[in-house]
């Protein structure tokens, strides 16, 4: 007996009902992207490896899915010296291999894989901007809704294949872009009925300033990567990792105020100003934060809350200014449902210097889980038809099909049961599909140019003409 088929760990199949709910979220996000003036683009699902590698830090690079070279690459083994075993590759214990072995491993990896699945949409977007710069009008506001892949450890709300919904602006250093992106977050989540989200904000310059004043400027990346894990491993875990990365005990004493910041936004700004008074870079970050938050406060938000979180680091190498992360309402145990930030020279890695950008992303899969848990999907979001015409034979099916054709022209979702089988089986099918209405057609209906319309929820059945049928199904 053949084994039961399955899907790879960290991936999912979606039922018609699930797809309808996902499309509801996507269409809501897309409509608001366009309302704010963003234009759509798409990029390939895989990129050249050198486009992606080295852009996400050491931890991010480890999570990139590599694609083996295709075709008859391995048939001609004389061209490549294959390792004899997995142990020889040392893939799962890279820290144990020597520099020489690492160099050989990198050479081998380069021979068997030159492409990789995209890790996010931001780096491919930077590549797109550089490649198509002569065709683009700057500032360029783009949105992109496509899947990405990460070789992560699957858990609740974390998958190896998932969609990102990104909006970015490149070609402008204006902080009004950040103000608008905060408003965009608020508008989208309000449209989805998800009230009480917290938009956390920080600034990479503030983190650089903190590293400077505690004497750990040379450990900035290690410092931010560890700090970004505060919600996962707690204060003690963060301090332990910092020490392991070579950050001194004295530096940890100086950084202690970070873990105790509290009060209003103004209070936090005052505490930051005291801590960073000797850092020009840090104070610049404070001023940028103040500009964004003051203007957002003047404009107002509908349902979201903007909060200054000085421990927010987002362990990605390319952020240079504002950093965003969106937390679900406190009633739901879920990680971030969005994030982003300012990147002043991301396109510089591809040769286009001084092209500042800022962008945000919506986590479709986690937003889905939150809406499902809070029962916020509208009842109108359904993959099913509004009505099914029962089949009593070819003559009746033809009469029904003429009505179906006209109803579909009115954008009403209807269908004909394909087979002339027992009526009980047809009703059972409609019930399992959660179709709310059934239309019955016999000689009496054909002769009187009418339709028997049955409400499958209440059991009520009435005779209607076509206009009455259309009005009910449109309601």
From Swiss-Prot:
Main location (coarse class): cytoplasm
Matching InterPro entries: aa-tRNA-synth_II, aa-tRNA-synth_II/BPL/LPL, Anticodon-bd, Anticodon-bd_dom_sf, His-tRNA-ligase, HisRS-like_core, HisRS/HisZ, HisRS_anticodon
CDD domains hit by this protein: HisRS-like_core (cd00773), HisRS_anticodon (cd00859)
Signal peptide: none
Annotated Gene Ontology cellular component terms: cytoplasm
Keyword list, A-Z: Aminoacyl-tRNA synthetase, ATP-binding, Cytoplasm, Ligase, Nucleotide-binding, Protein biosynthesis
Gene Ontology biological process terms from the UniProt entry: histidyl-tRNA aminoacylation
SUPFAM superfamilies in the record: Class II aaRS ABD-related, Class II aaRS and biotin synthetases
Catalyses which reaction(s): tRNA(His) + L-histidine + ATP = L-histidyl-tRNA(His) + AMP + diphosphate + H(+)
Subcellular location: Cytoplasm
A Pfam family assignment: HGTP_anticodon
Quaternary structure, from the entry: Homodimer.
Family recorded in the similarity comment: Belongs to the class-II aminoacyl-tRNA synthetase family.
Cited PANTHER family: HISTIDINE--TRNA LIGASE (PTHR11476:SF7), HISTIDYL-TRNA SYNTHETASE (PTHR11476)
Name of the featured protein: Histidine--tRNA ligase
Protein species of origin: Flavobacterium johnsoniae (strain ATCC 17061 / DSM 2064 / JCM 8514 / BCRC 14874 / CCUG 350202 / NBRC 14942 / NCIMB 11054 / UW101)
Gene expressing this chain: hisS
């Amino acid at each position: 007996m053949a084994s039961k088929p399955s899907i790879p760990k960290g991936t999912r199949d979606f039922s018609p009902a699930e797809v309808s709910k996902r499309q509801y979220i996507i269409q809501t996000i897309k409509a608001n992207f366009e309302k704010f003036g963003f234009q759509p683009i798409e990029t390939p699902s895989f990129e050249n490896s050198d486009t992606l590698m080295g852009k996400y830090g050491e931890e991010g690079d480890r999570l990139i899915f590599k694609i083996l070279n295709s075709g008859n690459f391995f048939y001609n083994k004389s061209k490549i010296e294959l390792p004899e075993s997995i142990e020889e590759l040392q893939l799962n214990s890279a820290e144990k291999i020597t520099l020489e072995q690492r160099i050989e491993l990198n050479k081998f990896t380069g021979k068997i894989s030159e492409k990789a699945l995209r890790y996010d949409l931001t780096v491919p977007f930077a590549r797109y901007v550089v490649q198509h710069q002569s065709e683009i009008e700057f500032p360029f506001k783009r949105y992109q809704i496509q899947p990405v892949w990460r070789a992560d450890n699957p858990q609740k709300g974390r998958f190896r294949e998932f969609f990102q919904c990104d909006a970015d602006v490149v070609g402008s250093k204006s902080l009004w872009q950040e103000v608008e992106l905060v408003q965009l977050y608020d508008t989208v989540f309000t449209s989805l009925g998800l009230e009480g989200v917290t938009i956390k904000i920080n600034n990479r310059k503030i983190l650089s300033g903190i590293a400077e004043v505690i004497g750990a400027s040379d450990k900035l990346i290690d410092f931010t990567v560890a700090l970004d894990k505060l919600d996962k491993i707690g204060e003690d875990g963060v301090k332990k990792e910092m020490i392991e990365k070579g950050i001194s005990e004295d530096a940890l004493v100086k950084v202690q105020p970070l873990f105790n910041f509290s009060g209003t936004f103004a209070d936090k700004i005052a505490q930051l100003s005291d801590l960073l008074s000797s850092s020009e870079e840090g104070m610049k970050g404070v001023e940028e934060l103040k500009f964004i938050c003051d203007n957002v406060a003047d404009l107002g938000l509908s349902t979201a809350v903007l909060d200054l979180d000085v421990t927010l680091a987002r362990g990605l190498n390319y952020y240079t200014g504002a950093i965003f992360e969106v937390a679900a309402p406190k009633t739901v145990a879920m990680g971030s449902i969005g994030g982003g930030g300012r990147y002043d020279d991301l396109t510089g890695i591809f040769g286009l210097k001084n092209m500042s950008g800022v962008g945000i992303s919506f986590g479709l899969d986690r937003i889905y889980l939150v809406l499902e848990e809070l029962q916020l999907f509208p009842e109108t979001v359904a993959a099913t038809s509004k009505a099914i015409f029962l089949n009593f034979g070819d003559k009746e099916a033809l009469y029904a099909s003429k009505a179906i054709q006209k109803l579909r022209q009115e954008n009403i979702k209807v269908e004909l049961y394909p087979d002339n089988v027992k009526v009980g089986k047809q009703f059972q099918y409609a019930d399992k599909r959660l179709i709310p209405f059934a239309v019955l057609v016999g000689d009496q209906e054909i002769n009187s140019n009418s339709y028997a319309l049955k409400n499958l929820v209440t059991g009520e059945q009435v005779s209607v003409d076509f206009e009455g049928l259309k009005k009910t199904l449109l309601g």
